[in-house]
Amino acid sequence: MYFNNELSDLKDHLLRKLQYYTYSDVVRDRINFILWEFKFLDCFLYLKSFPFASECGMLHVSQKMIEIWKSQWNKLIYICMYDEEGSPWDAVVYWKELISQTKQEFRAQYSFPKSPLAANEVIDDDDDDNTHSPEFVMEVIGFFVGNINVLVKINDPCSCFFVPGLKEQIEQILKELKLLRFLVCFVSNKCIVPQYRCTTFYTRALIEASYIAMVAWLYLPIYGNGNQDLAPSEVSRLLSDFMEMKIKSIEPGISRNSIYIDVLQALKSTIPQAQKKHVEIPTHSLTVGLSDQMANLQEMLCLLRDNLIHLPILDLEFHLQDMDSVIVDAGLLIYSLYDIKGQMEDTSLDVINWALGFDLPRNIEPIKVMAYLVMQKAFHCNLPRIHGLGYVDFLLKNLNDFQDCYSDSLAFLKNQLQVIQTEFESLQPFLKVVAEEPHNKLKTLNEDCATQIIRKAYEVEYVVDACINKEALHWCLERWLLDIIEEITCIKAKIQEKNTVEDTMKTVIARTSSKLARTPRMKEEIVGFEDVIENLRKKLLSRTKGQDVISIHGMPGLGKTTLANRLYSDRSVVSQFDFCAQCCVSQVYSCKDLLLSLLRDAIGEESERRELPDNELADMLRKTLLPRRYLILVDDVWDNSAWDDLRGCFPDVNNRSRIILTTRHHEVAKYASVRSDPLHLRMFDEVESWKLLEKKVFGEQSCPPLLKNIGLRIAKMCGQLPLSIVLVAGILSEMEKDVECWEQVANNLGSHIHNDSRAIVDQSYHVLPCHLKSCFLYFGAFLEDRVIDISRLIRLWISEAFIKSSEGRSLEDIAEGYLENLIGRNLVMVTQRAISDGKVKACRLHDVLLDFCKERAAEENFLLWINRDQITKPSSCVYSHKQHAHLAFTEMHNLVEWSASCSFVGSVVLSNKYEPYFHDLSSLHDFSISRILPNFKFLKVLDLEHRVFIDFIPTELPYLRYFSALIDQNSIPSSISNLWNLETLILNRRSADSHNRVLLPSTVWDMVKLRHLHIPNFSPENKKALLKNSPNLDDLETLSYPYFARVKDAELMLRKTPNLRKLTCKVKCLEYLHQYHALNFPIRLEILKLYRSNAFKAIPFCISAPNLKYLKLSGFYLDSQYLSKTADHLKNLEVLKLYYVEFGDHREWKVSNGMFPQLKILKLEDVSLMKWIVADDAFPNLEQLVLRGCQDLMEIPSCFMDILSLQYIEVEDCNESVVKSAMNIQETQVEDYQNTNFKLVLIEKWPKFYKLFSQLSLPRGLVLHLGIESVSSDEKEKKLTVTGDVDADEVQLVVEKLRKCGMPGL
C-alpha cells in the first residue's frame, strides 16, 4: 500500500526527523497514533482508483482529504521540510489536527456512510483483474484487521487509542472481518467452477471490508481528540445500527447475502480436498435470535469449530469431504436465514421453514451428528497409546468426589455415571490379573482389553470435566456416556469370551520355531572382556564335580551371545567335554525345536525324531547325556518357564558337566543358577572400546596416526556399548580414511547409533508387561547422564497412575517391585543401594535406552520434550500437542512460551540441564506461575524439580496429584485445600530462609489424599482447629519437616497421621530433663529423623516406635539414661545414626546386654563421646560401624572383636588410639575368626591434601584413604610410594601416623 508520492515524501521526511529526538510516553503515543492514521489513509488513497470506491464512501473521503490538504499544502511543506529550527512535534500536532478536521467535516456532510449498492451495479467484467484476486482481497482485509485490532489491546485511558465502552462493538467488527477473510480463503481453495461467481464474491467481500474499515476509521477512536463531535454513547449506537444494517436488503428485492448463497451453492458440486487451516466455521453472524433452533445451530457450529483444531491432519483429511458438505450446508442455511429475515421482520420459525422450503430442525441434525463425531474423534486420536493400569483406580475415587462436590452440575448424568462406576469396579479384578501376569501367549489379548478399558476411563474423566465446566452440550455428553456404557459392555463380552476359550488357546496356538526367531550367527572374533573370559573359563574347567550353570546376563548389545559362543568354541574348553550342544531359545520358542537342536548336535540328524512327542524327545536327550560329561549352551532365555522346559533334560551325575546360559534378565539368570553366581556383563572400558573400533575398521592393520585422536573420541562417544561401536565401525569402514570425514561422523554420531540400535532395544520393550511399559517410557522425561532419585521417580509414577493397586500392599512397595523388574531386565542401571536393606536409592539409564524412551514415547503420544533449542515455534504446533501427553522442559522460558498450546496436557516435568542441587538457591529467578496455569486445566503433575520459585500456590487445579517447587512465602493459603486430589506436595525454601517458620493452614488436613508432604520448618497455623475439626490424614506416609515446640504439638500431629512410615522433624529442646515422657509414634513408622532447633539441649520425650528401623538424631544433648530408655522401645531398630550429639556431663555411653538387638549399622559423627562402655552381648547383629570426627573417643570397645556379624569398620578423622583399636579388631576378625569379608577403612584428612581420595591396599585388608593423587604399597618391602602435589613433610606425617597405628616396619 502506497501513499501518493508527494504526501509520502512529506511523511517519510517527518519520520526521519522524529527519530533523532527523545520523547515521553505521552508524546510517543501520539506519534504512534498519527502513524496509525497514516496507515488507513495509505490504503484508502490506494483503493480510491477502483470502481467500487465511490460505492462505499471511500472516494468521497479521499477527495475530501485531498481538497483540505491542498489548501494547507504550503504550510505542510514548510513545517516538515524547511523549518529546521522548529521541533518535529509541531508537524505532528498539525498533522493530527488536519486528519481530525478531515474526519469531522466528512461526518458533518454525511450523517452515516453511504451504504454500498447491489453487486450487479458495481461490478464490471472489465475491472482490473487485481480486484478479483483472492490473495489481494485477503491482504487488504488482513491489513484492516491488524490496524483495528490495536484499539482492542490498549487499556490506558490516557492513550489516544483508548475507546471506552466500545470494546464489544470493535470485537464484533473484527469478527466480521476475520470471517470475511476466512470465507475468501475457503472459497478460493475449494471452488473450481463457475469462476464468474467467485469473481463476484471476491469483489463483494472487498466492498464489505472497505465499508467496515471506513466506519471504523471515521468514528474510532473518539478519545483524546479534543474536538470530537460525537459522545461515546452515540458512537456505540451508530456501530450497533451498522451491524444490524448488514442483514438488511440493499434495496427492495436485492439481498446483501445473495452472492454468498450463490457461491456456496457452487461449492456444493465442487468440494476438493483441502488442508485443515482452511476449514473455518461462520459462527460470527449467528447473533440473530430466530428461536431455540437457531441457538442450537450456533452451539453445534461452535462445538464443531472448537474440536476441529485438535484433529491431526491425517484424520482431518479423512473426514474433510463430509465436513465440507456440512460447513457449506450450514453456510447456505445461515445466509438464507439472513436473506429472508432481512425481508420479514418478526417472522416465526414455521413461516421461515415454509419460506425456505425445508425443515430447520431436520437440516440442523446432520450438523449435530458431525459435531459429535468430530468431538469424539478429536479426543480419541490424541490419546496416548501407552497407559498406566492405575488410571481406573483414580477415576473411581474421583467419580465419588466429583458427584459429591458438583452434584447439581452432574445431576442429569447421575444415572449414567453410576452405571459406569459399577462397570469399572467389576473390571478391577481383570486389570489386576493383567498387572500381575507374566509374559504368555494371551498377554496381547489381555493388554488390548486393558488398553480399551483405560481409554474409556480417559473419556469419562473428560466428559465429567466438560459437564462441570459447561464446555459441551448436555445432549452431547449424555450421548457420549451412553456410548461408553455400550462399549464397556462389548469389552466385558470380549473378556468373557477370552476366558472361555483360554484353555483351548493354550493348546492350539503353535509356538514359532526358534530357527525363525533368530538367524544363526556366524562365529565372531571377540575383542575385549579378556578378564571376563578368563574368569568364565576357570568356572567351566573347575574341579567341582557337580553340575554348574554359568549364567551371563546384561542389556541388549553387550555381546552376551558372542562371548558365550567364544567360550563354547574354545578348544581348551571343548576338549574337556564328551558332548557339546547348543540351542537358541528366543522370545517365542518351540520346545520341540529346542530338543531337536540339542539332539542334532549330540548324536546327529534324524528326520524320524520330528514325529516324536516332546516328552519322548526330552527323555531321549536325558538318556543321551546321562553317562557323559557335557557342555550345553542355552542362548537368549527370556523367562523362567523356558528354562523349566529344558532343565529336566540335563542330568547331574557329578561329572563336572557345565551349562552356559545367556539372558537379558537378572531374575532368569538367578533362577537358573546352581553353584556359580550369575555374571552381570559389564560395559566396555575406553581401551576395549578403541580396540574393537580399530579392529572392525582396519582389520589386522593399525589406525593411521592422523586418525587416532578422532578415532578415540568416536569410540568414547559410543557409550561403551559394543553394539554401538560395531555400528559406528560399519559407517567408518565405508568412508574415506581422512580426518574431515571422521569429524563428520563424530558430529552426527548420536542419531546414527541410536537409529540403528533401536531394533534391539525395541525387542526388549515389546515384551515388557503392560504395566511396565509406561514406567519405562517415563524415564524419557529425565536428562542424559542424570542420576535419578528413586523416591521422586516412584512418587511420579504413582501420581501418573502407572501403579495398579493391590490389596495388602502399599503403592510405594508395588512401584519398587516394578523398578526391580526393570533393573532385572537390564533396562535400568542401579547407581546406589541402601546399605541397610539393599533397596535402590538412585538409578540411571544408558543413553541408548534413554533416547529410545524419548523417541518411542513421542510416537505413542506419551511424552513430548520441549528443548531450549527447539526449532519449531509454539504457534506452529498448536494443533499437534496431544491431549494427555506428558511434557518435559529443560528451561522455564520454554514452559512459558508453550503453555498456551498445552491445554490438555496431563503433566509437566522440568528437567534442568544444570546440576540438580544448588548451593545458593537465592540466585534463581522468580517465576510467575499465575501466567501459565490457566492453560493447564487437566494438569495432574507439576514437577518444577525444586528449582523454580513461584509467586503463588496454585489452587485451581482439581486434578493435580503431584506438585513440587520453591517458595518465598512464610504461609500457605487456606485455599490449598482446593487441590483435593493432591498426593505429593513438596515446597522447598531458599537457603537463606530455611530457618523461617512456615505457617500451615488447618485446611491442609482436609486434603485426605496426601501421601507425601514436605515443607521445611512448618507448624500448624491453628492448633485448636486442627485438634477439633480436621480429619485424619490416613494416607500420609512421608512427613517432613514439621517443627514441634511442645510435646503436645507432636502428639497432636502424630494422632492425625496414624499411618506414617517416614518422619523428619525439628523439635524444641529443653535445658535438662529428670524424667522422660514416652512419645508414642505411629505403629507403622520405619524411619525417623530428629533435628534440634536450639543448640545441644535435651530431647523432650523418649521415642517409642516398635517397628522403627532407622533413627537419626542430630544436635541433641543425651545423658546417660536417654539412649538406654529409648532402646527399650526400639527393639527392631536396624540403623542408628548420631550426629553432633553431646553425651552428658561425663561424655560416656554405656550399652548394656540386650540393647539394640537388631541393629545392623551404627554411625557416630562429630559426637562428644570420650568413654564408650559396651557389654559383651550388646549389638549381636551389628554389621557396620562408622566413626567420623570422634576426636575425644579413647578407643573402640574390645567386644567388637567378638561380634561375628561385623563386616565393616570405617574410621575417619579420629585419634590414634581409635585407629589402633580398629586395626586390632580387624586383625582378630580376619586372622582369628577367618572373617574374609571383613573390611577396615581408615580415612585421614590432611590440611594440604585437596585432591580426590585414592585407595591404598595394605596388609591384612587395611584400606587407607589419602588426599593425594596416587599411593601404592609393597607389602614385602614395607615400602610406601606417594605421588602428587605433596611435599616430603606431608609424606613423613603419613608415615609416622601409620607407624603409630601398628605398622612400625614401614
Curated annotation (Swiss-Prot):
InterPro entries: Apaf_helical (IPR042197), Disease_R_plants (IPR044974), HMA_dom (IPR006121), LRR_dom_sf (IPR032675), NB-ARC (IPR002182), P-loop_NTPase (IPR027417), R1A-like_N (IPR021929), RX-like_CC (IPR038005). It is a peripheral membrane protein. It holds the Pfam family NB-LRR. Residues 1240-1306 form the HMA domain. It comes from the Eukaryota. Residues 407-428, 520-542 form a coiled coil. The keyword tRNA-binding does not apply. One of its GO terms (molecular function) is ADP binding. GO terms for biological process: plant-type hypersensitive response. Transmembrane segments: none annotated. Residues 521-808 form the NB-ARC domain. GO terms for cellular component: cytoplasm; membrane. ATP binds at residues 554-561. It is found in: Cytoplasm; Membrane. Keywords: ATP-binding, Coiled coil, Cytoplasm, Hypersensitive response, Leucine-rich repeat, Membrane, Nucleotide-binding, Plant defense, Repeat. LRR repeats lie at residues 858-881, 921-935, 936-961, 979-1007, 1010-1035, 1057-1081, 1082-1106, 1110-1129, 1130-1153, 1156-1181, 1216-1240. Its main location: cytoplasm. PANTHER family: AAA+ ATPASE DOMAIN-CONTAINING PROTEIN, DISEASE RESISTANCE PROTEIN RP. This protein is encoded by the haplotype A genome of the allohexaploid Solanum demissum. Confers resistance to late blight (Phytophthora infestans) races carrying the avirulence gene Avr1. Resistance proteins guard the plant against pathogens that contain an appropriate avirulence protein via an indirect interaction with this avirulence protein. That triggers a defense system including the hypersensitive response, which restricts the pathogen growth. Belongs to the disease resistance NB-LRR family. This is Putative late blight resistance protein homolog R1A-10. It comes from Solanum demissum (Wild potato). The gene is R1A-10.
